[in-house]
């Protein structure tokens, strides 16, 4: 009797996993919840007829174990190395909104993350 319940529960769990696999899309889920790098209107500084845009979105990033030969050359050895690109402005135009000088982004791309540099 015990084995019948165990087999029934196992089959039920297996069928649920198959169903979940078919329900979810088979696309790349690494950027789940994060849109691609593109221009978006800044609601704080934009005025009717004078929109201000900024670059927003996600780009590439990854982390991996630091190779031993690289670790030996570090002043402060770290076990994890990370690489990243950020959504930055490719082209900008300076604008004046309410006597405040702003930089209006006109084009975006994924490039070096400036705040990661030391």
Swiss-Prot record:
This protein's GO CC annotations: extracellular space; follicle-stimulating hormone complex
Positions of transmembrane segments: none
SUPFAM superfamilies associated with the record: Cystine-knot cytokines (SSF57501)
Function statement: Shared alpha chain of heterodimeric glycoprotein hormones. These hormones bind specific receptors on target cells that in turn activate downstream signaling pathways. Involved in gametogenesis and steroidogenesis.
Disulphide bridges: 34-58, 37-87, 55-108, 59-110, 86-113
Stated family: Belongs to the glycoprotein hormones subunit alpha family.
A UniProt-annotated Pfam family: Hormone_6
Protein name per UniProt: Glycoprotein hormones alpha chain
Compartment(s) where it occurs, according to its Swiss-Prot or TrEMBL record: Secreted
GO biological process: G protein-coupled receptor signaling pathway; positive regulation of steroid biosynthetic process; regulation of signaling receptor activity; thyroid hormone generation
Species: Ctenopharyngodon idella (Grass carp)
GO molecular function: follicle-stimulating hormone activity
InterPro entries, alphabetized: Cystine-knot_cytokine (IPR029034), Glyco_hormone (IPR000476)
Lineage top rank: taxon: Eukaryota
Keyword annotations of the record: Disulfide bond, Glycoprotein, Hormone, Secreted, Signal
């Amino acid at each position: 009797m015990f084995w019948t319940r165990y087999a029934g529960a196992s089959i039920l769990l297996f069928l649920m996993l198959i169903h979940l696999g078919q329900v979810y899309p088979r696309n790349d889920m690494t950027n789940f919840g994060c849109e691609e790098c593109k221009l978006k209107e800044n609601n704080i500084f934009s005025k009717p007829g004078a929109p201000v845009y900024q670059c927003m979105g996600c780009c590439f990033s990854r982390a991996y174990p630091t190779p031993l030969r690289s670790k030996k050359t570090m002043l402060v050895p770290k076990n994890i190395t990370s690489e990243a690109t950020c959504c930055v402005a490719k082209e900008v135009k300076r604008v004046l909104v309410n006597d405040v000088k702003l930089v209006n982004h006109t084009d975006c791309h994924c490039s070096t993350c400036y705040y990661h540099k030391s």
